């Protein structure tokens, strides 16, 4: 499986958070899966940290990049085709970072690992299910 981690998913995987469903944890731990994180997620975190909306500590982005390198999570750059895909998306919601992740998943045929309920509205494959969900 080729999977794109949403920004919150990356933070929760790094933190080994109990907010992660077992299915997502299993996907992230399976060495047969190719995992990706968008450079847009690093951009989003940088903006949120600079605005004081999230506190991750000094050098957080460098630490996250090192964690990605150590765990074979590939950085996904933003391409022109991703930008063109964003332009065609309906406006189910307006978060520009989410819209870019959706475009990247669609263009690069990636499954999104995200708790965001809006993603499925765009026809992208999303995995996020807690065992209590049925």
What positions do the PLM features span?
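Short, well-structured N-terminal submotif of metal-dependent ribonuclease cores
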Residues: 1-38, 51-66, 108, 117, ...
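Acidic active-site catalytic centers that drive phospho-/nucleotidyl reactions
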Residues: 6, 44, 98, 116
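Generic structural signal for small/hydrophobic residues in well-ordered secondary structure
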Residues: 7-8, 45, 86, 105
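Short, conserved active-site loops that position catalytic residues or coordinate cofactors/metal ions
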Residues: 39-47
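Phosphate- and divalent-cation-binding pockets in alpha/beta enzyme and binding domains
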Residues: 44, 85-88, 121-122
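Active-site neighborhoods of divalent-metal-dependent phosphate/nucleic-acid chemistry enzymes
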Residues: 55-65, 69-115
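Short, structured coil segments at secondary-structure junctions
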Residues: 71, 122-123
């Amino acid at each position: 499986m080729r999977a794109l981690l949403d920004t919150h998913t990356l933070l929760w995987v790094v933190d080994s958070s109990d907010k992660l469903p077992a299915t997502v944890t299993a996907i992230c731990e399976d060495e047969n899966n190719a995992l990706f994180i968008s450079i847009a997620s690093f951009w989003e975190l940088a903006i949120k940290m600079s605005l004081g909306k999230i506190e991750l500590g000094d050098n957080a982005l460098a630490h996250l990049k090192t964690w990605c390198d150590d765990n074979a999570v590939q950085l996904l750059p933003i391409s022109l085709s991703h930008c063109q895909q964003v332009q065609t998306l309906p406006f189910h919601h307006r978060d520009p970072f989410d819209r870019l992740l959706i475009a990247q998943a669609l263009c690069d045929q990636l499954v999104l690992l995200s708790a965001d309920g809006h993603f499925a509205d765009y026809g992208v494959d999303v995995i996020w299910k807690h065992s209590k969900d049925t």
